[in-house]
């Protein structure tokens, strides 16, 4: 109680004196700055779609192991898949991206294309394996590694792309909206997460898997035995074809609208520096 009282007194009684007359941006100005920066909008839309693809799969993968692969040890397979996928994502950020960038001498745009194509290939392999009736987790790790390695590289590349749009926006709009642009990354990730949860929930409802997932929690039961072949196929298609469609759209959208190559970024940085000199 004393802590709360003294904290309130400190907040009320101690005020920082600021001698800086700083113009702050309103919410309207923030969205206006984002809309006026076409390259930032391109990257933001790309982030939303790419993350939606990943989150749809991550939301449904537990149901895939539980109701499709099945078996009484499905939870062990799911845990192994998650562990390998998470480790792969970290290693991709730390090792694979620097390898492609520094040793293979690929620019960030080409790395992004490689990353998205790798993810699409992973989804295709996952769908083929599931359709062929593969029920062992070890082969499933192959597409999992491809998808999560792509996700790890995308985490790095998207941040770089956003950073590139800051100087572009300053040159175009005479305002450096750095905080606005980078704050949008968190917002769009949350947006993608929310939309993907909605899609996953709708899929579970339509495939009649939602009630099953809430009803029984006994790990010693093979849940896949009570699921129809149509529901299993529907689950496979939702968690692979929708992400594939999203990634293809993101690839086409990005290729059509993003213009900030490494050379262009250097030119813009030089122009901004000369303007501010």
Residue ranges and their predicted role:
Residues 1-277:
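Membrane-embedded alpha-helical bundles of multi-pass transporters/translocases
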């Amino acid at each position: 109680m004393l802590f709360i009282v003294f904290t309130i007194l400190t907040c009320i009684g101690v005020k920082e004196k600021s001698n800086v007359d700083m113009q702050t941006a309103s919410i309207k100005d923030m969205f206006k700055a984002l809309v006026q920066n076409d390259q930032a909008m391109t990257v933001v839309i790309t982030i939303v779609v790419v993350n939606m693809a990943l989150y749809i799969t991550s939301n449904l993968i537990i149901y895939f192991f539980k109701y499709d692969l099945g078996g009484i040890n499905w939870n062990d397979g799911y845990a192994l898949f998650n562990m390998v996928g998470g480790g792969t994502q970290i290693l991709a950020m730390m090792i694979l991206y620097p390898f492609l960038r520094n040793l293979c001498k690929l620019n960030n745009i080409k790395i992004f294309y490689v990353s998205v194509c790798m993810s699409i290939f992973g989804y295709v392999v996952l769908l083929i394996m599931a359709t062929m009736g593969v029920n062992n987790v070890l082969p499933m790790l192959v597409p999992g590694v491809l998808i999560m390695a792509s996700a790890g590289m995308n985490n790095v590349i998207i941040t770089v792309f956003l950073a590139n749009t800051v100087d572009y926006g300053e040159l175009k709009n005479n305002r450096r909206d750095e905080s606005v642009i980078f704050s949008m990354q968190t917002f769009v990730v949350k947006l993608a997460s929310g939309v993907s949860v909605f899609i996953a929930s709708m899929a579970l409802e339509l495939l009649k898997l939602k009630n099953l997932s809430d009803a029984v929690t006994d790990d010693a039961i093979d849940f896949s035995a009570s699921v129809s072949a149509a529901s299993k196929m529907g689950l496979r298609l939702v968690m692979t074809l929708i992400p594939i469609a999203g990634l293809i759209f993101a690839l086409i959208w990005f290729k059509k609208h993003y213009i900030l190559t490494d050379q262009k970024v250097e030119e813009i940085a030089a122009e901004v520096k000369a303007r501010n000199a």
